[in-house]
C-alpha cells in the first residue's frame, strides 16, 4: 500500500488510539493467525496495520456492539460511492435546524446505508466529534462550534479532497475527504464485519485479539447498555478463557487497582496516553493506562 493510498480512521471516537497505534503495534506478537478487534471503535490499530507494508493480514474480524458504527464500516467497504453522495447531501443542507432534524431521523432510521450517512455527518458536525447516546439509545450530542481537523471531513487542507462544497455554520466547516474514504474501502475489502458482543468472537489457537473496551471509571455511553463494572469483570473472565485456548491477546484499560487485580496473571505495562476528546484542548493532556498481554513483549513491566 503506497503512502498516498494509506487509509486513516474515518470517525472520531472517544478513547481512540491513533496517537498510541505505533506503541500498540510494537507490542503485538511477531506472528499470529487471524486478527480480531471486538471493540473496533475508530479502528486506529487496524488502520495502522494496513499502512505497514511489512504486515500481511489474512483473516480480519472487526466488530463492535454499536450498530450505527458497524453500518458505517459496512457502507465504506461495500457502497463507498453511494455513501459519499449521501453524506455530501447532508453536508449541503447543514444548518443548526437541519442538524437537529438529522439527529431525530438518526434515532428512528433502519436503512443501513442512510444510518451510515447520518452517523458520519453527525460524528463530524456534533460537539467535539463525540458519539454519545442516552438510555433509550438515542444520539444526544449537541451541534459543534469548533472546526475539528479530520481525515474524513477535511477542515484544514488548502486544496479540498472533495468534489462537493463545504458547509459552514459559524466557524464550523466540513467537507468529505473522499480520497481517504476510498482508501478505507480498499483496506476493508477483505474484512469480516459483525455487530456483536465481544464474547461472540471465535478465535482459534494462535490467533490475535486486540481489546479496547470503554475504560473502567470513564465515559462508556457508546451504546444504551453502557459498560459497567460487571461488564469489565466479564471481559476479564473472557480473557482468561482466551488464554486457556492458546489465543494471543492485548488489552488496553485504565491504570487502577481493580484492573491490575483482574489481570494479575498476565503482563502489565503502564502507558501515558493522550486524551483525544475533552471539553477544551487545554484539558486533553495525558492519562495513565495499562497495556495487558498474555505473551512476552518488549519493555513489559509490572510496576
Swiss-Prot record:
Keyword field: DNA replication, Methyltransferase, S-adenosyl-L-methionine, Transferase
Protein name from the UniProt record: DNA adenine methylase
Gene Ontology MF annotations: S-adenosyl-L-methionine binding; sequence-specific DNA binding; site-specific DNA-methyltransferase (adenine-specific) activity
Disulfides per UniProt: none
Function summary: Directly involved in methyl-directed DNA mismatch repair, DNA replication, and gene expression.
Enzyme class label: transferase
Family: Belongs to the N(4)/N(6)-methyltransferase family.
List of residues binding S-adenosyl-L-methionine: 13, 17, 64, 212
GO term, biological process aspect, one: mismatch repair
Organism annotation: Treponema pallidum (strain Nichols)
Catalytic activity annotation: a 2'-deoxyadenosine in DNA + S-adenosyl-L-methionine = an N(6)-methyl-2'-deoxyadenosine in DNA + S-adenosyl-L-homocysteine + H(+)
Keyword flag Mitochondrion: no
Underlying gene: dam
PANTHER family: DNA ADENINE METHYLASE
EC number: 2.1.1.72
Top-level taxonomic group: Bacteria
Pfam family, any one: MethyltransfD12
Amino acid at each position: 500500500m503506497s503512502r498516498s493510498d494509506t487509509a486513516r480512521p474515518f470517525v472520531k471516537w472517544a478513547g481512540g488510539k491513533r496517537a498510541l497505534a505505533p506503541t500498540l503495534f510494537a507490542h503485538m506478537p511477531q506472528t499470529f493467525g487471524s486478527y480480531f478487534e471486538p471493540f473496533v471503535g475508530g479502528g486506529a490499530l487496524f488502520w495502522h496495520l494496513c499502512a505497514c507494508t511489512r504486515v500481511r493480514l489474512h483473516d480480519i474480524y472487526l466488530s463492535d456492539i454499536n450498530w450505527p458504527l458497524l453500518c458505517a464500516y459496512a457502507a465504506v467497504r461495500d457502497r463507498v460511492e453511494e455513501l459519499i453522495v449521501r453524506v455530501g447531501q447532508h453536508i449541503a443542507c447543514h444548518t443548526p435546524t437541519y442538524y437537529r432534524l438529522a439527529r431525530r431521523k438518526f434515532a428512528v432510521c433502519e436503512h443501513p446505508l442512510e444510518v451510515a450517512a447520518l452517523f458520519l455527518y453527525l460524528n463530524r458536525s456534533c460537539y467535539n466529534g463525540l458519539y454519545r447516546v442516552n438510555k433509550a439509545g438515542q444520539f444526544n450530542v449537541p451541534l459543534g462550534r469548533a472546526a475539528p481537523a479530520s481525515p474524513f471531513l477535511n477542515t484544514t487542507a488548502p486544496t479540498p479532497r472533495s468534489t462537493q462544497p463545504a458547509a459552514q455554520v459559524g466557524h464550523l466547516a466540513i467537507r468529505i475527504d473522499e480520497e481517504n474514504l476510498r482508501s478505507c474501502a480498499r483496506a476493508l475489502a477483505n474484512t469480516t464485519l459483525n455487530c456483536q458482543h465481544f464474547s461472540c468472537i471465535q478465535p482459534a489457537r494462535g490467533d490475535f485479539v486486540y481489546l479496547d473496551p470503554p475504560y473502567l471509571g470513564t465515559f462508556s455511553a457508546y451504546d444504551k447498555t453502557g459498560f459497567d463494572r460487571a461488564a469489565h469483570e466479564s471481559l476479564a473472565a473472557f480473557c482468561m478463557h482466551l488464554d486457556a485456548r492458546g489465543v494471543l491477546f492485548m488489552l488496553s484499560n485504565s491504570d487502577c487497582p481493580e484492573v491490575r487485580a483482574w489481570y494479575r496473571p498476565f503482563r502489565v505495562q503502564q502507558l501515558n496516553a493522550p486524551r483525544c476528546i475533552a471539553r477544551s484542548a487545554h484539558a486533553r493532556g495525558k492519562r495513565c493506562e495499562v497495556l495487558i498481554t498474555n505473551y512476552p513483549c518488549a519493555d513489559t513491566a509490572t510496576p
